[in-house]
């Protein structure tokens, strides 16, 4: 049987074309430590010249979740790759690690070279923002597993940190100040609820602007996750950071305690930062209690860092000089978990 594999739904030539198209984007991410090029059986990275006394590799993996369904609906695929990178590199930078390289995994029902190129273009942009190299990946065409228009996307990153500079939160104590770095929006968590509340129950259109949103709903929901690597690494050069939390699934309530030692809790001052209109819209349309919102979404803060009180204002200034919106949002206290003070300030 001629072209048996193609008749089974796998187009090898389309896969080759996709690889050819993505090469120019991958090349823009290359660090000098990368050995070899795209197309080998494995990616190689030379650690020998990195100036660390006791180098420790730190790895992370994550996906984009059901935010992908918004990309399918909007037929927009050039930013979802930024999300994949962000979810991985933000997780390892909170331990003090500099991301070195990234690998992607794309599984699809039908290999569409143009669509795959757009996905990888976003991944490459995320890698440039994080300062890491895209050294490999896998594109798997799986007819019957996914529909022709569907794909899944996951990523994997490896970073490095000097052993004595690993941030674990073990030295956190009461009286440290918590600084929040603004998110770009929803980031990549909570989209199953977002779709149910706004699109299914609320019957909202992705093309319309609602309430106090400044963009059409689809553009707002597809804003890429903010990558905090460069400002955080700059911060670590100048100030001691005692703990960091990437605010992802589980929001404030689940993620902040991950950086706190036993016997220490966090007190958050509501109103110390502005919460973006998209969160207000979700809360109002879905009639969701405030506490639950903080247990699902980042609520406008994508990263929390703990520093000494005497350094707090200087740290905020440094982060602002790096282009971030940063706020003093609370403090560590004796106890456990996360407590909230005051009322919420919505933009």
From Swiss-Prot:
It catalyses: 2-formamido-N(1)-(5-O-phospho-beta-D-ribosyl)acetamidine + ATP = 5-amino-1-(5-phospho-beta-D-ribosyl)imidazole + ADP + phosphate + H(+). GO terms for molecular function: ATP binding; phosphoribosylamine-glycine ligase activity; phosphoribosylformylglycinamidine cyclo-ligase activity. It is an enzyme of class 6 (ligase). The keyword Nucleotide-binding applies. Signal peptide: none annotated. GO terms for cellular component: cytosol. Pathway: Purine metabolism; IMP biosynthesis via de novo pathway; 5-amino-1-(5-phospho-D-ribosyl)imidazole from N(2)-formyl-N(1)-(5-phospho-D-ribosyl)glycinamide: step 2/2. This is Phosphoribosylformylglycinamidine cyclo-ligase.
């Amino acid at each position: 049987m001629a072209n048996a594999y193609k008749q089974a739904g796998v187009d090898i030539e389309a896969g080759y074309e996709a690889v050819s198209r993505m090469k120019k984007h991958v090349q823009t991410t290359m660090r000098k430590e990368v050995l070899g090029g795209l197309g080998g059986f494995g990616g190689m990275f030379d650690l020998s010249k990195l100036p660390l006394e006791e180098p420790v590799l730190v790895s992370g993996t994550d996906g984009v979740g059901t935010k992908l369904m918004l990309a399918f609906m909007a037929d927009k695929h050039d930013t979802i790759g930024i999300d994949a990178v962000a979810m991985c590199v933000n997780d390892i930078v909170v331990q003090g690690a500099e991301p070195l390289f990234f690998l992607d995994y794309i599984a699809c029902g039908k290999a569409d070279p143009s669509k795959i190129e757009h996905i990888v273009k976003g991944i490459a942009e995320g890698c440039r923002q994080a300062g890491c190299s895209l050294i490999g990946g896998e594109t798997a065409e799986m007819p019957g597993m996914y529909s022709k228009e569907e794909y899944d996307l996951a990523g994997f990153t490896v970073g490095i940190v000097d052993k004595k500079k690993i941030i674990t939160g073990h030295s956190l104590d009461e009286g440290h100040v918590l600084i929040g770095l603004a998110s770009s929006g929803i980031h990549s968590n909570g989209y199953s609820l977002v779709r149910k509340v706004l699109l299914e129950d609320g019957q909202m259109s992705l093309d319309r602007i609602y309430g106090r949103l400044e963009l059409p709903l689809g553009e707002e929901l597809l804003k890429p996750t903010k990558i905090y690597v460069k400002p955080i690494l700059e911060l670590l050069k100048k100030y001691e950071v005692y703990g960091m939390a990437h605010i992802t699934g589980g929001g404030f309530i689940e993620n902040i305690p991950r950086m706190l030692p036993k016997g220490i809790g966090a007190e958050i001052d509501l109103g110390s930062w502005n919460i973006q209109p998209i969160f207000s819209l979700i809360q109002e349309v879905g009639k969701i209690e405030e506490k639950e919102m903080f247990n699902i979404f980042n609520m406008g803060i994508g990263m929390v860092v703990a520093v000494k009180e005497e350094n707090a204002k200087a740290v905020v200034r440094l982060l602002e000089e790096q282009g971030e919106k940063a706020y003093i949002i609370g403090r560590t206290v004796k106890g456990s978990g996360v407590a909230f003070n005051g009322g919420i300030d919505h933009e």
